């Protein structure tokens, strides 16, 4: 999930991960019209929801006769691969499920088709989708009715925990004796740290376990997607809400410093050794192997974890990102689906968008492993009981925040990755110094973009 303005693109790519592995999948329907050769290629990341989308797409092929082809690449290569495709005006992708932070660059560089007229013609209303997903995935400029994507995959950071460990009488008794309260999913980050410390180094079923898993990955976006969950709760702001691009005193406020210090303290006290460059997959591995009591990760992975034969079912529980001293927020994940502007199959791609937006399709999308953003699905009376993590997902989507979606967001992200990782993992400098340097980095980026950066 990275994008830099065209002038800096080659420089950024050289510093980023260059290798990628493509996975092309094809789902062909049985309708005779498919033989006419109509085909769409949809590009996304290679993960469980993408497999669900392939299954869902079979219905589109049966209905339309249009064959669906899929280009899926690992998350570590997702931005490199597809932003290169878009930047070079490649016609590989007709449809793309692009990250939320791409929306500014994609709109301003005319990579995506603007969908306002199409939505009006087909009576697709953004009022029918969760507000956070419309703002995060569809709008550019933000808070304006200019739409470049349909919300496709609602997602955010949540937590899993070993419910079976938490429920053991001997563990409950020891915890209550030590802390004077019942052992339960944490409601605040202070409680989370306390629980993590309690489990750190404990032996359970003959195996040494650790308190918590949090993101530390350096190369793409991982540590930023982790630390922001704490920073938001402690009062960090990207800029002055009343004065855009005024970052001094907001990015590096005393509250933000405390949040960054807390994330480092949690990393130092309560995580497994060696996880110095870890993101989504490493978290899944740690939880599935019985290494950790609690795990930070995206809701997208929770259906698969719940089905896991070793740690799923009655053994797993879910909770929302805990609150901090200044509020309760969660880092937004997820993506919208867009039509690539240079596609030779624009009409067919728009037909897919129309089909995908239907309530019945969205309901099935949720049932088979995707995360719908459609209110008709998520606000239905039975939704909270439709999955063990559904209530937490609903709650989380009411308090999400996101990283910059500016066209220069790639450099902004690289800057934050470096400053946070240097402090948290590499033990370079103080939290105040890290955030002060980040303000300088971001000020330089925005000034190069011609933005008026206010110092006070």
Locations of regions flagged by a protein language model:
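Short, low-complexity disordered leader/linker segments with a strong preference
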Residues: 1-41, 62, 444-456
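Extracytoplasmic "Venus flytrap"/periplasmic binding protein-like
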Residues: 38, 55-132, 136, 149, ...
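Extracytoplasmic "Venus flytrap"
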Residues: 39-55, 73-76, 155-156, 221, ...
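Extracytoplasmic/periplasmic substrate-recognition and gating elements
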Residues: 87, 141-145, 164-165, 169, ...
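Hinge/lid segment of periplasmic solute-binding proteins
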Residues: 100-158, 223-226, 315-322, 382-387, ...
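Extracytoplasmic/periplasmic solute-binding protein
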Residues: 139-153, 157, 188-248, 292
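Long, aromatic- and glycine/proline-rich binding clefts that accommodate carbohydrate-like moieties
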Residues: 141, 313-320, 367-423, 451-456
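Glycine-centered hinge/linker elements that transmit conformational signals in sensory
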Residues: 191-200, 234-277, 321, 439
């Amino acid at each position: 999930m990275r994008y830099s303005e065209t002038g800096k693109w080659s420089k950024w790519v050289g510093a980023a991960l260059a290798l990628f592995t493509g996975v092309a999948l094809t789902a062909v329907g049985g309708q005779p019209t498919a033989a006419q050769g109509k085909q769409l290629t949809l590009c996304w990341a290679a993960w469980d929801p993408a497999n669900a989308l392939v299954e869902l797409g079979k219905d589109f092929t049966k209905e339309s006769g249009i064959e669906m082809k899929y280009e899926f690449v690992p998350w570590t290569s997702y931005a490199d691969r597809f932003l290169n495709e878009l930047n070079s005006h490649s016609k590989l992708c007709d449809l793309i499920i692009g990250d939320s932070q791409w929306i500014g660059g994609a709109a301003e560089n005319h990579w995506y088709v603007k969908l306002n007229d199409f939505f009006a013609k087909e009576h697709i209303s953004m009022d029918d989708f969760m507000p956070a997903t419309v703002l995060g995935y569809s709008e550019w400029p933000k808070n304006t009715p200019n739409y470049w994507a349909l919300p496709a995959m609602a997602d955010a950071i949540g937590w899993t925990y070993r419910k079976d460990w938490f429920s053991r009488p001997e563990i409950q008794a020891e915890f209550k004796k030590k802390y004077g309260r019942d052992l339960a999913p944490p409601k605040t980050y202070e409680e989370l740290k306390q629980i993590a410390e309690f489990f750190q180094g404990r032996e359970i079923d003959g195996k040494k376990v650790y308190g918590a898993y949090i993101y530390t990955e350096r190369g793409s976006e991982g540590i930023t997607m982790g630390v922001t969950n704490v920073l938001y709760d402690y009062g960090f702001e990207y800029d002055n809400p009343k004065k855009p691009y005024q970052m001094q005193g907001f990015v590096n406020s005393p509250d933000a410093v405390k949040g960054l210090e807390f994330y480092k303290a949690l990393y130092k006290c309560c995580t497994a050794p060696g996880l110095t460059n870890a993101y989504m997959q490493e978290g899944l591995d740690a939880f599935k192997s019985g290494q950790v009591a609690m795990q930070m990760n995206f809701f997208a992975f929770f259906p698969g974890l719940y089905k896991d034969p070793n740690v799923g079912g009655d053994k797993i529980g879910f909770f929302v990102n805990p609150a901090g001293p200044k509020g309760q927020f969660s880092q937004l994940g997820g993506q919208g689906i867009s039509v690539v502007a240079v596609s030779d199959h624009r009409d067919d791609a728009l037909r897919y968008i129309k089909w995908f937006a239907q309530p019945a399709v969205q309901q099935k999308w949720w049932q088979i492993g995707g995360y719908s953003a459609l209110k008709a699905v998520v606000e239905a009376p039975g939704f909270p009981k439709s999955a063990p993590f559904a209530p937490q997902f609903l709650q989380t989507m009411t308090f999400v925040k996101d990283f910059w979606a500016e066209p220069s967001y790639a450099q902004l992200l690289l800057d934050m990755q470096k400053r946070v990782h240097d402090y948290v993992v590499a033990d370079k400098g103080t939290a105040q110094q890290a955030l002060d340097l980040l303000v300088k980095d971001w000020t330089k980026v925005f000034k190069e973009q011609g933005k008026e950066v206010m110092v006070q």
